[in-house]
Amino acid sequence: MKKDSVIIVSGGMDSVTLLYEHKDEIALGISFDYGSNHNAKEIPLARMHCERLGIEHITIPLEFMGRYFKSSLLEGAEAIPEGHYEDENMKSTVVPFRNGIMLAIAAGIAESRGLRHVMMANHGGDHAIY
């Protein structure tokens, strides 16, 4: 199978599952450091899983998101809500257009490298906020 894909891999369970499911198609794993409270733990895991599979991994810094966007998911913001992952709790964790920004960058990198596909594993429980 031809390695003609880029994957956006956070290091969380959704993107890592997609990484393993399509490992034979993926030429590049991309993580984004956008100031999330989870980045320090998840990005090293994304890198580790890519290395384990022999897939190149890069991390792209997006510091501007932490400075200009409001979300409880970002470092220095209000606490992330505890409890069940309900619609109201989810709304405070939204980083506005985060996935769109990451997808646009990944698509540009894919195009620049002659890769045909971009893979992204969005969390199914986020439906209420989009």
Could you describe each region identified by the protein language model?
Residues 1-130:
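ATP-dependent adenylation/nucleotidyltransferase module used to activate substrates
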